[in-house]
Design a protein with these regions (language model features):
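Non-heme Fe(II)-dependent double-stranded beta-helix
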Residues: 2-7, 17-57, 64-178
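Non-heme Fe(II)/2-oxoglutarate
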Residues: 30, 92, 218-219, 257-262, ...
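Active-site rim elements
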Residues: 121-127, 173-175, 238-252, 270-273
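Secondary-structure boundary elements
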Residues: 139-148, 177-181, 190-198, 209-210
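Short, structured patches in soluble enzyme cores that scaffold and shape functional sites
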Residues: 153, 158, 173, 185, ...
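Short edge-strand/loop segments of extracellular domains
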Residues: 156-159, 204-212, 286-292
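A short beta-loop-beta micro-motif enriched in histidine and acidic residues
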Residues: 171-184, 248-249, 255, 278
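Double-stranded beta-helix
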Residues: 184, 194-268
Length: 365
C-alpha cells in the first residue's frame, strides 16, 4: 500500500492509495498544463535572475539548500539505517569501515548505484522527491506545475572499496544524438558534505551548447561505443579531444547536504567514487511536464508504480525495470523488488506518479 498524506494538514489527515495490483484512475482525470512560454531554451536573450541563467550558460547548476539541513540530515540517517538493517542486518556498521563489503550490504555497483530491492520506492526516496524546494526548481525550468517524476535509483558510494571493480571515468550524455535540443533536465539531491575527495558528479561545462555540432561531426565515427539504448552516448578519446579543442572544461561539482544538482541531458558527465573518509550519498530526481508523456507512457508508468519498479531517469517511463541484481554471480536472494518501508505520498506526490493524468481506461501492460 502507498499511504498518501496531506503534509499541509494535520498528521491524522491521511488517505490510503493501493499500489499492490491496480491503482484506480480517477473518474475525473486531471488535464496537465503543458510547458509554458518561459520553458528553458524557449526564449532568446532572456535573463531570469536565478539559477536558470547558470543552467543556460553552463549546462549545469547547483541549487543551494533545496532541502533544509534538518530534513536532509534525517534522510541521510534513514539511508544509513536502511543499510544497517538491510535483510534483517547483514553486518554493516556505519562506524566500522571493515564492514563495508558486499556480503554486508545490498548490491551496490562500482559507480555507487543501488538499483534493486524496490529502493526507487523506499520511503526516504519518495520523501526526497516530494520536497517543495526540489519540485520548485523543475517547475521554474519547465514553466508548469504539472510534472511527473522518475522512479530512479539512489547512490550509496563508500570510499576505498576493494570488493568492487574500479570506477573508471565513463563520460557520456543521456540523450539520443539524433534528437537535438533541450529534452530532459537531470537532477540529484546531495545528502552528505561532498568536497574534492568525496567523489561525485563531473560535468563538461558549456558542452551542451556544442552538442549538435559535435554529433554532426561524429555521426559516422568508426569506434562508436555500444549503448543499450539510443538515449545514451559514450564519448571516445577522439570525442574527448574534440571537446578539449573547443575549450570545454571538466568540473567536479562540490555540494553541501540538501543541495540540488541539475544538468542538461546534453551535458557530458560521469561520476567519481569517494577517496577520502566520507561516503557519497544522493538521490536522483528527474521531472518533466506530464503533458509531454503520452497516455501509453502514463499507463506504463502506472504499472511500474504498482509493481514498485524503477524507470531510470526518464519520468515518462521510457525504460522500465533494470539490470539483473547479482550477488556472487547469482540473482540476489534479498532482491524482492519491494521497498522495506511504505512511502507516504501527499496529494502532490501522487500527481508526480502520473496516475491522476491518465485519461483512458486502464489496460493491462
Amino acid at each position: 500500500m502507498i499511504i498518501a498524506t496531506d503534509y499541509a494538514s494535520a498528521p491524522t489527515a491521511t488517505v490510503t492509495v493501493s499500489a499492490t495490483k491496480h491503482t484506480d484512475v480517477s473518474s475525473k482525470p486531471l488535464v496537465p498544463k503543458p510547458a509554458g512560454p518561459h520553458k528553458l531554451f524557449s526564449e532568446t536573450g532572456v535573463t531570469y535572475g536565478d539559477f536558470r541563467d547558470d543552467l543556460l550558460r553552463d549546462g549545469y547548476v547547483v541549487v543551494k539548500g533545496a532541502i533544509p539541513r534538518e530534513r536532509v540530515d534525517k534522510y541521510g540517517e534513514e539511508m544509513m539505517s536502511y543499510l544497517e538493517n538491510f535483510a534483517g542486518g547483514l553486518g554493516f556498521n556505519r562506524n566500522d569501515s571493515a564492514t563495508i563489503k558486499e556480503s554486508n550490504l545490498p548490491v551496490i555497483t562500482e559507480k555507487g548505484m543501488c538499483l534493486g530491492y524496490g529502493i526507487a520506492h523506499e520511503s526516504f526516496t519518495w520523501s526526497i522527491r516530494q520536497e517543495p524546494g526540489v519540485i520548485d526548481a523543475f517547475e521554474k525550468v519547465y514553466d508548469t506545475p504539472d510534472l511527473i517524476v522518475s522512479f530512479d535509483a539512489v547512490n550509496m558510494a563508500f570510499p576505498n572499496r576493494t570488493d568492487v571493480k574500479p570506477n573508471k571515468p565513463w563520460p557520456h550524455q543521456d540523450q539520443d544524438p539524433e534528437k537535438p535540443g533541450f529534452r530532459c533536465l537531470q537532477g540529484l539531491v546531495n545528502i552528505f558534505p561532498n568536497g574534492e575527495k568525496d567523489g561525485g558528479l563531473i560535468v563538461c561545462k558549456g558542452a551542451h551548447l556544442l552538442s549538435e555540432d559535435f554529433h554532426a561531426e561524429f555521426k559516422d565515427e568508426p569506434n562508436k561505443i555500444w549503448a543499450w539504448t539510443k538515449e545514451w552516448y559514450g564519448f571516445t578519446d577522439e570525442g574527448m579531444q574534440w571537446l578539449k579543442n573547443k575549450g570545454c572544461e571538466w568540473v567536479k561539482i562540490n555540494a553541501e547536504p540538501g543541495d540540488l544538482l541539475l544538468w542538461d541531458s546534453r551535458t557530458p558527465h560521469y561520476n567519481l567514487s569517494p577517496e577520502g573518509d566520507r561516503p557519497r550519498f544522493c538521490a536522483y530526481t528527474c521531472y518533466m511536464p506530464a503533458a509531454d508523456a503520452s497516455q501509453e507512457d502514463l499507463l506504463w508508468k502506472k504499472a511500474a508504480f504498482e509493481k514498485t519498479q524503477s524507470t531510470t531517469h526518464w519520468p515518462n517511463a521510457m525504460h522500465v525495470g533494470g539490470i539483473p541484481i547479482l550477488r556472487d554471480g547469482e540473482p540476489c536472494p534479498y532482491n524482492t523488488g519491494k521497498p522495506r518501508e511504505t512511502p507516504r505520498l501527499g496529494e502532490r506526490g501522487f500527481r508526480l506518479t502520473g496516475i491522476p493524468y491518465v485519461q483512458t481506461e486502464p489496460i493491462q501492460v
